[in-house]
Regions:
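Conserved alpha-helical scaffold segments that buttress catalytic/binding sites
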Residues: 1-171
Length: 171
């Protein structure tokens, strides 16, 4: 496991944080190959964790799981900022006929009106995503990869102020 190769000591905090806050890894559970059922399962698992007043962290290979994972947060919090790190916008309505594709995962998250989006590092966007991006410019801010030397991090801080932030990384 990759997590076994990480040092547990944090030099900034001068401690091993897991000893103070605790970390629990769930036992692996079966995920259905049907994407809608899989997303429903992820939503249910995260809801159970939130109901226990714990903080869930979910890991997948890319953003396909995010629309399911974020559902309990959309119910619990009135204003959520989805902080998205990726090379692609993932704002398509569907991809190859699949509404819940990796290429439309972030769009599915924005189906919830209380979710806003900040994307960092986008270098690719399809023509079909542009109208949605323009129509929702009040909810979406993209920090383009080509402009990284000009990113205004103070603007970023203002965008997330007083919001609950949900992080998603495409790896």
């Amino acid at each position: 496991k990759a997590s076994h190769q990480v040092e547990l000591y944090d030099e900034e905090l001068n401690c091993e944080p897991y000893k103070k806050i605790g970390i629990k890894t769930l036992k692996p559970f079966k995920i259905n190959k049907n994407i809608k059922k899989a997303l429903s399962k992820m939503s249910k698992v995260n809801q159970e964790i939130l109901d226990k007043k714990l903080f869930p962290m979910t890991f997948g290979g890319e953003h396909s799981i995010t629309p399911g994972c974020i559902v309990p947060f959309t119910k619990k919090y009135k204003d959520i900022c989805l902080l998205h790190f990726d090379a692609h916008a993932d704002l398509r309505e569907s991809y190859n006929g699949e509404k819940f594709s990796h290429a439309s995962a972030i769009k599915r998250c924005l189906d919830y009106p209380n979710v806003s989006l900040i994307s960092f590092g986008i270098r690719n966007i399809s023509k079909s995503e542009i109208p949605f991006l323009k129509k929702n410019s009040s909810r979406i801010k993209i920090f383009w990869a080509k402009d990284k030397m000009k990113w205004d991090l103070n603007k970023f801080k203002k965008l997330i102020k007083n919001k609950k932030v949900y992080l998603t990384f495409d790896v």
